[in-house]
Amino acid sequence: MAEKIGEFSMEHVVTSYSRNANGDIVSTTDWKGSGSSTTLGGAQVFGTFISAAPLSESNEKSGEIEFIGESFLENGTQIGNVASGAWEKAENEHSWKISMEGENSLGHKRRYEGTVDLENLIFNGEIYSLD
């Protein structure tokens, strides 16, 4: 079982759209915020979520998502992070549930779970160790 080691809160900065070679719509959203963990302490966090889907699936209830970002720790250390997983529209709510697994540049495996509130564009979540 994964151990909870931290929490984070990020706010939306900007979204851009493009098309890939398959003609899918690619959504790229940038976020910034802060987080803390029992293993690394506090950090400023910046990252990008990327998802792609055909135009005909624009109103889907779920899909794949990936995250690429960096954490800037209070001690000056910079850590890269990558993760992939899924998003799902919450039933009867204006929000998305996101669950991803990935690793950081220190080699630690992590799971991230959280909710994006689409009214105020805030992503709050928890970090779990998979080591």
Model feature map: region roles:
Residues 1-131:
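Beta-strand-enriched cores of mature, soluble protein domains
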